[in-house]
């Protein structure tokens, strides 16, 4: 079933022999599921309701730190209490480094025989290895594009809204401007705009988030953004936090934002708006998913139950319930959205299309910066403000802000994270 399972059983047998603690094996069918997600009272109650249809599950919400400490301690002891682990992608490199997780490649193959999973997310679960599946993707949240249907008539000839390029988005925005006399593309500069820069623009043009920060490709990207896109961005964008209100008010016709900050537009007027994936650049279709995965520790007392529960969590029916009740989007194909609100169903289609794009390039939230995570956001925002709003020299700005970025990486020791290639030690800019 699981690769390396023999190793775990040998350890457990040694423990049993030495201590007589036969209780390390699970009795009955109970599965203990520890998760860093759904750890508020309201969310955990909803999660338990979903899990109740599987059977006897002990759902244990946890913060990341205590979960890691527990799994490390149980690995060292050779016996455990946790069967299934649910956590953000960024938790799994730590668990992999401690060597506490089964390789789930065989289980993944079984699941993929039944359901379609985004290949980009499957690769993330390998954590840079060739064939060791540390986790199987469970659910996602992300940022997408939205447009009023009145804007569709201005799409460039031959453009596919589900496979746009950044150049086509700029041409679309220009066409709208030429026809209406107004800049109608909206960006949440006062909101989560740093994620737009980190997870969408930079990966699409440079192939990474960090290493290519000051490269020739980055310079070309900023030149394009400043001259070809920004002139057609609504001037009030610098004050926009959420894009759903400007869309509903008709101030903008096309917008980028987090799904949670667009949902009101789709729910209130589903007949007026469409959702679609972010555009692609020369290096791919950069996008920033919040990927949550499921893993099974070597010390799981009930690994068979963990496998069955993992399969249950990835069934289209369960994925639909998680979306409806807990607002995380599915990672499997075939999810029935007919019972969901119109807005959620509209967004789900775009989220799925984005993750399953052949050129999908997932850019993960910064990893390894600890309490200084906010500093990287300021560096990208400063680059934007200085280049686009203040008109400073692009290369000069990138050299200066790049030095700040490298200092942050060096001082925290943060290794590179996807889509940048793994690094030994602190991530280094090119």
Indicate residue ranges for each PLM-predicted region.
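Conserved N-terminal structural module of periplasmic/extracytoplasmic solute-binding proteins
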Residues: 3-4, 8-9, 22-93, 321, ...
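Glycine-centered hinge/linker elements that transmit conformational signals in sensory
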Residues: 170-177, 210-239, 266
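A ligand-binding cleft/hinge motif common to bilobed small-molecule-binding domains
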Residues: 91-96, 257-272
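Extracytoplasmic/periplasmic solute-binding protein
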Residues: 125-143, 162, 167-211, 217, ...
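Paired acidic/hydrophobic, glycine-rich loop segments that form the ligand-binding mouth/hinge
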Residues: 83-86, 253-258, 274
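Extracytoplasmic/periplasmic substrate-recognition and gating elements
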Residues: 151-153, 227, 233, 267-333
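Long, aromatic- and glycine/proline-rich binding clefts that accommodate carbohydrate-like moieties
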Residues: 324-386, 414-430
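Hinge/lid segment of periplasmic solute-binding proteins
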Residues: 88-144, 274-279, 343, 426-430
């Amino acid at each position: 079933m699981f690769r390396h399972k023999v190793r775990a059983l040998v350890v457990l047998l040694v423990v049993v022999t030495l201590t007589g603690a036969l209780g390390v094996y699970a009795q009955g069918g109970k599965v203990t599921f520890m998760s860093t997600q759904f750890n508020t009272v309201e969310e955990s109650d909803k999660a338990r309701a979903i899990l109740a249809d599987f059977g006897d599950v002990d759902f244990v919400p946890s913060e990341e730190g205590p979960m890691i400490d527990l799994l490390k301690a149980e690995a060292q002891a050779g016996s455990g209490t946790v069967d299934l682990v649910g956590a953000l992608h960024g938790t799994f490199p730590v668990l992999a480094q401690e060597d506490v997780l089964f390789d789930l490649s065989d289980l993944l193959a079984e699941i993929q025989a039944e359901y379609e999973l985004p290949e980009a997310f499957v690769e993330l679960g390998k954590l840079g290895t060739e064939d060791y599946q540390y986790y199987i993707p469970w659910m996602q949240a992300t940022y997408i594009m939205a447009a009023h249907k009145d804007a569709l008539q201005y799409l460039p000839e031959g453009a596919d809204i589900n496979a746009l390029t950044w150049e086509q988005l700029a041409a679309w925005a220009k066409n709208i401007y030429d026809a209406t006399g107004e800049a109608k593309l909206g960006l949440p500069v006062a909101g989560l705009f740093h994620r737009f820069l980190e997870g969408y623009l930079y990966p699409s043009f440079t192939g990474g988030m960090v290493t290519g920060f000051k490269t020739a490709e980055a310079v070309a990207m900023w030149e394009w953004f400043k001259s070809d896109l920004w002139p057609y961005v609504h001037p009030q964008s610098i004050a926009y936090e959420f894009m759903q209100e400007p869309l509903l008010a008709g101030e903008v016709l096309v917008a980028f934002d987090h799904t949670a900050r667009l949902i009101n537009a789709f729910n209130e007027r589903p007949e007026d708006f469409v959702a679609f994936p972010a555009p692609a650049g020369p290096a791919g279709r950069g996008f920033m998913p919040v990927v949550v995965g499921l893993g099974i520790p070597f010390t799981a007392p009930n690994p068979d139950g963990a496998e069955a529960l993992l399969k249950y969590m990835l069934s289209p029916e369960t994925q639909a319930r998680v979306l409806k009740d807990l607002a995380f989007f599915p990672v499997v194909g075939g999810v029935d959205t007919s019972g969901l609100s119109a807005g959620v169903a509209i967004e789900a289609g775009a989220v799925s299309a984005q993750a399953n794009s052949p050129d999908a390039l997932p850019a993960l939230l910064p990893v390894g910066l600890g309490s200084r995570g906010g500093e990287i956001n300021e560096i990208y925002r400063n680059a934007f403000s200085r280049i686009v709003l203040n008109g400073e020299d692009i290369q000069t700005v990138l050299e200066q802000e790049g030095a700040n970025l490298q200092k942050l990486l060096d001082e925290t020791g943060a290794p590179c994270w996807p889509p940048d290639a793994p690094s030994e030690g602190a991530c280094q800019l090119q």
